[in-house]
């Protein structure tokens, strides 16, 4: 059985130690994150497993607040001829370590009990004497220390790296706990591994994380594909002369709910448990707070609604009618309420039976696909410590609405594929299952 690696996370107050752990653990509830010093007052332990095997124990430590005071004590009460670790041990046995420098003592004890430490640096900060003092006393613990830069975006690290090099700290990593980068995390673990006599545990962790990342991506795209097929197969029939407006509104409501359920599954998959999709979510991008039937969203994603007199029919509606004679009059009748009806298809069976069939239009299916891929991108690039609002970059629809993937076109003629038709979710899921895998491969973020 492999002995787990123990890793202390240390640094000045409010540099992002707990945030780093939240992101590495994929746990947005670990510890407490505030924009205030000394939020963490005690050492907290967390564990990364690979199945039943424990790989790495991570220790969140209190912030170092008065390393200069500790260094002064060491220089006054210990001999420069003693090894650094002996001087630290003398400090930890002192009265001051249990009173005046209680927080610093907790950090140093944990470092000495660990295999190595990560020293978290706020890259926005200038190089100050207090940080030099912290690195000095940490180095006396005689454990490998790797600096980790947080908040690195648009920051010049030259002054920092020069200072670190003068202290013989040549291996470091940049890892933004807010704007998550999976490959950046892998580099962090890889850099840590280079500082150990044996790297087998961290190599195993790296391989596990790569497998997990690929699994999450595959499962997420399958969830999206399954939702799109469910929505595409959703149909309702009404009599030829019935007002479709009430039915259309019900259909829109059911698709909204179906989308929300799928989005929540993506949140759970990526372990953002306490965040909800919708207007109550403070950090969600504007696009996700908008109704999927909002015409502005079509413009946002560059989705064209067609040409000619019927182009405006889809705007704000999101559902077509495969209808029969008299459809033009019908469109005029409800145009003021729902933006019009697009008589885009003629179904001979409906015509004979005097029926209208309502179903989700290609533009709305394309919009839904674009929205869900955007959400996936957000979840894959957001650290679990992030608390701020996200601004989406300009993103495009995954396909031309006039050229839906064959799987969605097939769904539109197989009403049993939709749980909204059958009210039997598992049965409908089984009906469309064979097409989920192929559609998911066409969903490119």
Functional labels for PLM-detected ranges:
Residues 1-91:
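Conserved G1/Walker A P-loop phosphate-binding module
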Residues 63-65, 124-126, 152-155, 178-181, ...:
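Conserved nucleotide-binding/hydrolysis micro-motifs of P-loop NTPases
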Residues 29, 67-70, 129, 157, ...:
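Active-site-proximal flexible loops/turns
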Residues 38, 143, 150-152, 177-178, ...:
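An acidic- and aromatic-residue-enriched active-site/binding cleft used to recognize and process polar
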Residues 151-216:
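Canonical P-loop GTPase G-domain recognition
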Residues 78-172:
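Conserved C-terminal guanine-recognition region of P-loop GTPase G domains, centered on the G4
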Residues 37-74, 186-200, 248-268:
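Internal hydrophobic scaffold segments of catalytic domains
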